[in-house]
Amino acid sequence: MDLARQIAMELLDIQAVYLRPQQPFTWASGVKSPIYTDNRVTLSYPETRTLIENGFVKQIQKHFPNVDIIAGTATAGIPHGAIIADKMNLPFAYIRSKAKDHGVGNQIEGRVYSGQKMVIIEDLISTGGSVLEAVTAAQSQGIEVLGVVAIFTYQLAKAEQAFREADIPLVTLTDYNQLIKVAKVNGYITADQLVLLKKFKEDQMNWQS
């Protein structure tokens, strides 16, 4: 089994991902979604965590071999990023969603330098907005962001467009298409539910109609 399928299976097994087309979740944006993802759960399962961190290292070495520093997004990317940096013997920093309003007002915590080549770690890509704000924060300090690596992406067109416009490569360990395929093969969803899940990916506002 390849890594993408293996991680998709793990996310389903440990209930980091819930698929509920008949009882949709409501996202913070108000969108009714047949899927809910909480990849923070992966940290509680050592075998799953090791699989994910080794997958991160493999993808970084493959796509971004010249990396100087690993950064995690606050808060979900921090634990994964710290483990990855340790495995790769690289410096680590994390990037807040906004600068602190006290102290020295840092948005990036850790020792970073202009000219460093950074890879940013995120756990989940939905629209891509928050991690691309982290990219901008790093770039504003003269850091070269080589790319973003995440556990999972919903593969929404809005996110793909945002990464293209930002000219930032995105690499994920697994994705929505892989997950729903694995879910169907392993009996987590029915054929009818698979149809709804495919419709959601294409049209988040009208998939239920």
From Swiss-Prot:
Catalysed reactions listed for this entry: orotidine 5'-phosphate + diphosphate = orotate + 5-phospho-alpha-D-ribose 1-diphosphate
Annotated EC: 2.4.2.10
Enzyme class: transferase
Keyword Magnesium in record: yes
Superkingdom: Bacteria
GO MF terms held by the record: magnesium ion binding; orotate phosphoribosyltransferase activity
Disulfide bonds: none
GO process annotations (BP): 'de novo' UMP biosynthetic process; pyrimidine nucleobase biosynthetic process
Keywords recorded for this protein, A-Z: Glycosyltransferase, Magnesium, Pyrimidine biosynthesis, Transferase
Signal peptide: none
Any Pfam family the entry gives: Pribosyltran
InterPro entries tied to this protein: OPRT, Or_phspho_trans_dom, PRibTrfase_dom, PRTase-like
Record: residues binding 5-phospho-alpha-D-ribose 1-diphosphate: R96, K100, H102, E122, D123, L124, I125, S126, T127, G128, G129, S130
Binding-site list for orotate: S126
PROSITE patterns: PUR_PYR_PR_TRANSFER
Coiled-coil annotated residue ranges, if any: none
Known pathway: Pyrimidine metabolism; UMP biosynthesis via de novo pathway; UMP from orotate: step 1/2
Cofactors named for this entry: Mg(2+)
Functional summary from the UniProt entry: Catalyzes the transfer of a ribosyl phosphate group from 5-phosphoribose 1-diphosphate to orotate, leading to the formation of orotidine monophosphate (OMP).
NCBIfam families xref list: pyrE (TIGR00336)
PANTHER family in UniProt: OROTATE PHOSPHORIBOSYLTRANSFERASE, URIDINE 5'-MONOPHOSPHATE SYNTHASE
Stated family: Belongs to the purine/pyrimidine phosphoribosyltransferase family. PyrE subfamily.
Self-association state and partner proteins as the record states: Homodimer.
Name recorded for this polypeptide: Orotate phosphoribosyltransferase
Native organism: Streptococcus agalactiae serotype V (strain ATCC BAA-611 / 2603 V/R)
Lineage, broadest ranks: Bacteria, Bacillati, Bacillota, Bacilli, Lactobacillales
Gene this protein is translated from: pyrE
